[in-house]
């Protein structure tokens, strides 16, 4: 018996080891341009594995051919046709090939989503047709057509022809015979036509459905969308002007596959479908089912306020039931201006996720409600760490609902993610909740976290990721309700990839703009959020950002708004550093960052704090809050100091400690000591916390946080990303130094001047020298109790003597200590330690 079992095991292992899957892929491009195009293929079933690139090695009468051999028996693989190293995708969506008996042969047509298992017709077709307005349709064709031949063109609505007025080239620089055409109709498409089958027919071409794009802008709806709850009834509203019909499916349980009730929704105009369901639906789950563009789609609500685990279903909730005790009296810290904020960036799991945090609810929302937690050597951890440090605001990496990962799995070592793959923007992420299946629990726990932080005077800034979503098509509630409309696409129907994440949201579309404004105002009103950081803010159009600012500051003028003034590589910037002046929206100051730490792209390049050469002018620009200080060299992008976020590190790229360590290792002229690296760390903190503008600290920067040199730890385990409180104990002097600097800034308004005029009046640069920046804040700047304050940064690797202005000066910050207590009193000159900062004052 044992022999038979052994033989069976050998046979099974042999089958796995020696089996092979062969896939033949035929690819046809209508433009005949194959250079650079290749395949990315990955195993899906029965086992999922990483992908690999495969080249086309042959050709036939259809086009190019690739023969792909995989050393395992597969039944399904994923496939992407891509240009070079992800320069572009032929089709935006991931596609899949079904395999039988270890073999598959497929045909792929340029720009066509369907994968063919038999050789398809390659005759001309309409790639994509889109309605730009009620009279204008633009279409991209596989082959050129003569626009002078209007008689070739026909547009039908449910089979009924609409007269064509004229046909012209869509690109005015093109010639008349072109594959990009504009069709102008004699009659306008009506609102009811949007829900019908509109088809473009060109003689000699395969016809195409017309996708409604900018035409939908005319059907803006300014009312409340989603599930509008009351104990007596719930009103369901969804915006889908292109759907023939919409139903709401009601479920008693999140795992149910069959609804207990199906309710037909009624079209109310302006693209909105509505259904009223009587009774108390608190805790009921729901989905929408819609038919548009010839497909029946089932989706969660893009306006979901609550969901079941892993966003399987939306949920109706009585939000009043989710409020912790005393919620009506909860308030965040009130500040006069952004400049009063000291921002500290954290991730929910990072700050309490490791064993040595001493927190019970490790890595969860409730972990940040636990008080008086201790770590190694009795150092404070979690919430208590934030309170001891003294920061005014925490910037929390995404904690809205994101797609990646299983919310029921709390093993952050096995699975971890920053959360920059949005799915449902108005719902808290379930992975940080004690019970993701209960739609009320995650909401209540976020509120408890916010309340606990507010209790200690700490505001909550939410990291929002509007420029892209995790996926498109079936992986996007936007695309399910109104395909294509919410995204930027090109003339061929391909999703633009300005974000570098596979798609980019069209913030300029009125209903997308409404969604963004609705989302941030909802978080403020329901969760008492105190600010927002906008990921890839440069991809959001200026009008939308201004509407966000107006809406939020109407609620609370102290809400802090800032973001990344860039997008993906090479993307056009719509709201960059040059756009923030006068908007009450701040931008991350990458010039100041690089001056302090050196290039984020080349770890060996030293910044000012490591003795880097030629950084003095850029440091000065940062010191003055990036305003136009002198109209010459000391000027930058800001009209007001509130518009610059001054930072040296954040979750992206290397931590400050890791960056400086790598720069030290690359230094062929010098052996760096740990003490010198600590000095660089402290000098960076001193520059940030004594400069005008808004200081921003990467969580753990205050105790030399390391991620073991991982410069993109978005999915690294918690052992890499977590706050290691052993390091806080090890570098407690660096922590105390930052704590003292924060106390100094909070108690002295001279470091928090509120406008450019005050800065130019009260801030005077003093003689410096190579790698020295010195300035005076004079005449009780900002109403400061100290008459004059001198700040000196020494970026030299050796001690330096500096001549002080006349008088006796009280030192409150030197290379070892920082705070508001006098360390010593000096006159005439002061000896500056290497890589150090000094703050001195006189009455």
Curated annotation (Swiss-Prot):
> Which of UniProt's keywords are assigned here?
Glycosidase, Hydrolase, Signal
Q: Where is this site: Transition state stabilizer?
A: 652
Q: Which SUPFAM superfamilies match?
A: (Trans)glycosidases, E set domains, Starch-binding domain-like
Its catalytic activity? Hydrolysis of (1->6)-alpha-D-glucosidic linkages in pullulan, amylopectin and glycogen, and in the alpha- and beta-limit dextrins of amylopectin and glycogen
Record GO biological process:
carbohydrate metabolic process
* Catalytic residues (UniProt): 535 (nucleophile), 564 (proton donor)
**EC?**
3.2.1.41
* InterPro entries found in the cross-reference section: Carb-bd-like_fold, CBM41_pullulanase, Glyco_hydro_13_cat_dom, Glyco_hydro_13_N, Glyco_hydro_b, Glycoside_hydrolase_SF, Ig-like_fold, Ig_E-set
Any keyword Transcription?
no
GO MF annotation, one: pullulanase activity
Top EC group: hydrolase
Keyword check for Transmembrane, yes or no.
Answer: no
Record's signal peptide: 1-19
User: What SMART domains does this protein's entry cite?
Assistant: Aamy (SM00642)
Q: Which family does it belong to?
A: Belongs to the glycosyl hydrolase 13 family.
Protein name listed in UniProt: Pullulanase
Q: Which organism is it from?
A: Thermotoga maritima (strain ATCC 43589 / DSM 3109 / JCM 10099 / NBRC 100826 / MSB8)
Question: Gene encoding this chain?
Answer: pulA
């Amino acid at each position: 018996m044992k022999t038979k079992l052994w033989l069976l095991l050998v046979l099974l292992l042999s089958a796995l080891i020696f089996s092979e899957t062969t896939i033949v892929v035929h690819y046809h491009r209508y433009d005949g341009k194959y250079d650079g195009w290749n395949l990315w293929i990955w195993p899906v079933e029965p086992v999922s594995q990483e992908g690999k690139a495969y080249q086309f090695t042959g050709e036939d009468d259809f086009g190019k051919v690739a023969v792909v051999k995989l050393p395992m028996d597969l039944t399904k693989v994923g496939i992407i046709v891509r240009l070079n190293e992800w320069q572009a995708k032929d089709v935006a969506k991931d596609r899949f090939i079904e395999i039988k008996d270890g073999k598959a042969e497929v045909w792929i047509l340029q720009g066509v989503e369907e994968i063919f298992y038999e050789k398809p017709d390659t005759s001309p077709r309409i790639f994509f047709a889109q309605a730009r307005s009620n009279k204008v349709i633009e279409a991209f064709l596989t082959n050129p057509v003569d626009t002078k031949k209007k008689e070739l063109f026909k547009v039908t609505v449910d089979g009924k022809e609409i007269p064509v007025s004229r046909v012209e080239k869509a690109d005015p620089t093109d010639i008349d015979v072109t594959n990009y055409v504009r069709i102008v109709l004699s009659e306008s498409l009506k609102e009811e036509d949007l829900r019908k089958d509109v088809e473009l027919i060109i003689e000699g071409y395969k016809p195409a459905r017309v996708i409604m794009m900018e035409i939908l802008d005319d059907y803006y709806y300014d009312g409340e969308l989603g599930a509008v709850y009351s104990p007596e009834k719930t009103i369901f509203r969804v915006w889908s002007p292109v759907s023939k019909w919409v139903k709401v499916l009601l479920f008693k349980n999140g795992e149910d596959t069959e609804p207990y009730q199906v309710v037909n929704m009624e079209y109310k105009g302006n693209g909105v479908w509505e259904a009223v369901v009587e009774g108390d639906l608190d805790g009921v789950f729901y989905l929408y089912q819609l038919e548009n563009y010839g497909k029946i789609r089932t989706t969660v609500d893009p306006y979901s306020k609550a969901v079941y685990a892993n966003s399987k279903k939306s949920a109706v909730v009585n939000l009043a039931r989710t409020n912790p005790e005393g919620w009506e009296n909860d308030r965040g810290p009130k500040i006069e201006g952004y400049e009063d904020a000291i921002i500290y960036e954290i991730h929910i799991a990072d700050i309490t996720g490791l064993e040595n945090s001493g927190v019970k609810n490790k890595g969860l929302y409730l972990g940040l409600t636990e008080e008086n937690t201790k770590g190694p050597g009795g150092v404070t951890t979690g919430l208590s760490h934030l309170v001891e440090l003294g920061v005014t605001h925490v910037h929390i990496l995404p904690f809205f609902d994101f797609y990646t990962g299983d919310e029921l799995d709390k093993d952050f070592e096995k699975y971890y993610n920053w959360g920059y793959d949005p799915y449902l923007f108005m719902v808290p992420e379930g992975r940080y909740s004690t019970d993701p299946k209960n739609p009320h629990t995650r909401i209540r726990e976020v509120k408890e976290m916010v309340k606990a932080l507010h209790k200690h005077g700490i505001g909550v800034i939410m990291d929002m990721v509007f420029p892209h979503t995790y996926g498109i098509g079936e992986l996007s509630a936007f695309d399910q309700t109104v395909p294509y409309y919410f995204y930027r696409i090109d003339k061929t129907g391909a999703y633009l990839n300005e974000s570098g994440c596979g798609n980019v949201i069209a913030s300029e579309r009125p209903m997308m703009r409404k969604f963004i404004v609705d989302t941030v105002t909802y978080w403020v009103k329901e969760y008492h959020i105190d600010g927002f950081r906008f990921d890839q803010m440069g991809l959001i159009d200026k009008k939308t950002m201004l509407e966000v600012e107006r809406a939020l500051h109407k609620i609370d003028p102290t809400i802090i708004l800032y973001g990344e003034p860039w997008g993906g590589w090479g993307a056009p910037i719509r709201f960059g550093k040059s756009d923030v002046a006068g908007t009450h929206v701040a931008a991350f100051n990458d010039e100041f960052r690089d001056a302090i730490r050196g290039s984020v792209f080349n770890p060996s390049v030293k910044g000012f704090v490591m003795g880097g050469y030629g950084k003095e002018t850029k440091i000065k620009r940062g010191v003055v809050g990036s305003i136009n200080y002198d109209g010459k060299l000391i000027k930058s992008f800001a009209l007001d100091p509130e518009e610059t976020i001054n930072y040296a590190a954040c979750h992206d790229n290397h931590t400050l400690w890791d960056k400086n360590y790598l720069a030290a290792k690359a230094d062929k002229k010098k052996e760096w000591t740990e003490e010198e690296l600590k000095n660089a760390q402290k000098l960076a903190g001193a520059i940030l916390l004594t400069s005008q503008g808004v200081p921003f600290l990467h969580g753990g920067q205050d105790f030399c946080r390391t991620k073991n040199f991982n410069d993109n730890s978005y999915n690294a385990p918690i052992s890499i990303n977590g706050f290691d409180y052993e390091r806080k104990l090890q570098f407690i002097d660096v922590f105390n130094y930052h704590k003292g600097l924060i106390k100094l800034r909070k108690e002295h308004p001279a470091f928090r001047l509120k406008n450019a005029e005050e800065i130019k009046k009260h801030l005077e640069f003093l003689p410096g020298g190579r790698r020295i920046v010195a300035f005076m804040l004079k005449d009780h700047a900002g109403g400061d109790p100290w008459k004059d304050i001198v700040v000196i940064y020494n970026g030299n690797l050796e001690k330096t003597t500096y001549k002080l202005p006349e008088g006796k000066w009280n030192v409150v910050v030197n290379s070892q200590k920082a705070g508001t207590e006098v360390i010593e009193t000096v006159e005439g000159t002061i000896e500056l330690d290497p890589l150090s900062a000094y703050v001195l004052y006189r009455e």
